[in-house]
Swiss-Prot record:
The keyword Magnesium does not apply. This is Glycoprotein. It is a single-pass type I membrane protein. GO terms for biological process: entry receptor-mediated virion attachment to host cell; fusion of virus membrane with host endosome membrane. Primary surface antigen capable of inducing and reacting with virus-neutralizing antibodies. Almost all human and veterinary vaccines are based on the functional aspects of the G protein. Pfam families: PH_Rhabdo_glycop, Rhabdo_glycop_CD, Rhabdo_glycop_FD. Glycosylated and palmitoylated by host. Glycosylation is crucial for glycoprotein export at the cell surface. The chain crosses the membrane at residues 460-480. GO terms for cellular component: membrane; viral envelope; viral membrane; virion membrane. It is found in: Virion membrane. Disulfide bonds join 43-302, 54-226, 80-113, 178-188, 208-247, 242-271, 363-370. Attaches the virus to host cellular receptor, inducing endocytosis of the virion by using different host proteins including TFRC, GRM2 and ITGB1. In the endosome, the acidic pH induces conformational changes in the glycoprotein trimer, which trigger fusion between virus and cell membrane. There is convincing in vitro evidence that the muscular form of the nicotinic acetylcholine receptor (nAChR), the neuronal cell adhesion molecule (NCAM), and the p75 neurotrophin receptor (p75NTR) bind glycoprotein and thereby facilitate rabies virus entry into cells. Arg-352 is highly involved in rabies virus pathogenicity. Its mutation dramatically attenuates the virus.
Amino acid sequence: MVPQALLFVPLLVFPLCFGKFPIYTIPDKLGPWSPIDIHHLSCPNNLVVEDEGCTNLSGFSYMELKVGYILAIKMNGFTCTGVVTEAENYTNFVGYVTTTFKRKHLRPTPDACRAAYNWKMAGDPRYEESLHNPYPDYSWLRTVKTTKESLVIISPSVADLDPYDRSLHSRVFPSGKCSGVAVSSTYCSTNHDYTIWMPENPRLGKSCDIFTNSRGKRASKGSETCGFVDERGLYKSLKGACKLKLCGVLGLRLMDGTWVAMQTSNETKWCPPDQLVNLHDFRSDEIEHLVVEELVRKREECLDALESIMTTKSVSFRRLSHLRKLVPGFGKAYTIFNKTLMEADAHYKSVRTWNEILPSKGCLRVGGRCHPHVNGVFFNGIILGPDGNVLIPEMQSSLLQQHMELLESSVIPLVHPLADPSTVFKDGDEAEDFVEVHLPDVHNQVSGVDLGLPNWGKYVLLSAGALTALMLIIFLMTCCRRVNRSEPTQHNLRGTGREVSVTPQTWKIISSWESHKSGGETRL
């Protein structure tokens, strides 16, 4: 017989399937009642079970999921967006330069994106330089365009890897899912036409590292394997197991929702699509730890109550409540009818909320209907109160449930800008706002007045300027010649020493201005 301390199936069935310890258990199937003596009372051992007489234990190795899986397998990745920055320079006639920057998108290639990502992660200055605005060229009276291609890497961008079909899930993908990442195709399209998603590690197999090797003991009967004792000493049955692949690895999904990869000779069917593997994380391990502590404490309380019953030779409803099975599965139910101790076989199910078994006043739901009482007595210490309400002793004990609520926490992950469903993309290929924050600022640089003439206007202006300059030169040359001719004549007149003044009326010659001034005036 397998040692009872190693058989632990009921404990694992509940917490791994439901994630929380039940606030209560109640029979969903209840056999006929039969009278018993107090010496037939026993405390249920909620930690043990016996399995089909598999007594042969042998050491073996198996593979199971690591702690932390498989709620979601995170695959780190990055997005790559192609951007073209265009610098347009116009130099006008007077030499002023106007520079205008424009940004558009281009479709990136996976190889170029991988190289840009490696540059960024390695701190290579080539990545930052690739994001700088182009140095514009210029030419007088011409418009010169200079373009520069850049790849904007935004990381991290985390996607969830589905271990069942190895597809990726993220809101950055067009339909929320990408099935194209494989050896031949190492990128996914996104909900932006000029952005692709790529995994950080090009070796995709490393992203599905969710398994660990363990040692245990195989429990068998002849050539048939009934179950095994895992590395932690917990027994797990193979009854009801089905075949299921995770990340391409064939294994068995057990009835409690756990997954193992082990060699068996048993005929096993494939799991239907709705048979998935339960969560195995640190929180579930913590819950199992709390469950074990609670079950051990409850068993001690049950043994104390049983000892009190044997000592006092008397039974109370409150003491009978300690004999209830605390985990789903087969067990016993006890009650007192007409001062007679009664026992019945029962199959217990878990209760998550009290409303499940107390739908209305005076009704205790068992097996889908209100269970009848006998003089206000049900079973397992449950009675009908004077006011007509069903009284359950354990209803006031909610400490463990509070522990479960304390373990719950919410996490706000980093959201990639493309994952925002409210993002409105621009029409055409104009650069989007979400990449602008990763690029240097662009603005119009104006060094002076821009005449804004078309190409033919520039040549007309040039011709008019040349003609004006030629006419100005001719005019200046003409003026200079006239000035040079007048200067010799004036010089000759000053050289005679006397100035002659002619009066047309008298034709009389006045010798000089000095004689006229001294009084030699001749009257007509």
